[in-house]
């Protein structure tokens, strides 16, 4: 990252021509301290993303890495986060478990709990966006409901997986990474609630599950995707 204010300030320092070693040492120490503080401020600019876990296939475990039999909602949020160490490079991550269910068991009670909590959570200055891990069976219904009831311009992203966490080629880790990228992107502000699956960013009003097997399970057939995530960037 290039900070032209920093470059300008250092160029001014370099114009000084001290005639004694004490002054030269002071300028050197001051410049070093300034650069250290600037580096710290850059590190703090990572977005603060809070992850709410509800269970689903993304947190599922199976008896076989190649089989299709599994139990949803078995992996806790801290394990999901730990499984994707790259998350710490793109955001300051916090997380909490809301429920541990398959999304076929999603209820009005959980929906209302999520809506009330999100409206409170998104008012906090230290929260820049929220990711919700969710089963895919009722993900579109949850997204649509939250899009109507959450009153904030901050990004809210639902994410899931078509393969359990113990699968040989689990899609959950990359989906979670892409969801955090999306929740922390300036392009996502004011877009409403979104679903991120298999690199596609879909609006809650248009997303629907079109396939029960393929990792490209969600589409927005009437409006198309809002965008996509590629190489850790929102496009």
Regions found by a protein language model. Give the residues of each.
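Boundary at the C-terminal end of the N-terminal hydrophobic targeting segment
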Residues: 39-43
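Short hydrophobic targeting helices and cationic amphipathic motifs
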Residues: 4, 9-13
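Intrinsically disordered, low-complexity segments enriched in small/polar residues
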Residues: 1-3, 38, 65, 71
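Active-site histidine-anchored catalytic micro-motif
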Residues: 44-235
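Bacterial N-terminal signal peptides that target proteins for export
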Residues: 14, 19-28
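Short intrinsically disordered, low-complexity coil segments enriched in acidic
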Residues: 1-5, 35, 232
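Bacterial N-terminal signal peptides
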Residues: 28-38
């Amino acid at each position: 990252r290039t900070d032209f204010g920093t470059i300008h300030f250092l160029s001014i320092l370099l114009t000084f021509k001290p005639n004694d070693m004490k002054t030269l040492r002071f300028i050197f120490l001051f410049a070093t301290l300034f650069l250290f503080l600037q580096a710290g401020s850059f590190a703090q600019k990572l977005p603060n993303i809070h992850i709410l876990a509800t269970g689903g296939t993304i947190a599922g475990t199976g008896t076989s890495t190649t089989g299709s039999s599994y139990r949803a909602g078995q992996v806790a949020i801290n394990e999901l986060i730990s499984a994707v160490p790259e998350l710490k490079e793109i955001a300051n991550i916090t997380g909490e478990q809301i429920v541990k269910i398959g999304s076929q068991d999603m209820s009005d009670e959980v929906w209302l709990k999520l809506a009330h909590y999100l409206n409170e959570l998104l008012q906090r200055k230290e929260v820049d966006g929220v990711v919700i891990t969710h089963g895919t069976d009722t993900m579109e219904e949850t997204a649509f409901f939250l899009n109507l009831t959450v009153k904030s311009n901050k990004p809210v992203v639902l994410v899931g997986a078509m393969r359990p966490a113990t699968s040989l080629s689990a899609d959950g880790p990359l989906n979670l990474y892409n969801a955090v990228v999306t929740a922390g992107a300036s392009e996502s502000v004011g877009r409403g609630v979104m679903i991120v699956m298999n690199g596609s960013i879909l609006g809650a009003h248009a997303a629907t599950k079109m396939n029960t097997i393929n990792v490209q399970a969600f589409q927005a057939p009437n409006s198309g995707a809002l965008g996509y995530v590629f190489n850790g960037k929102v496009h």
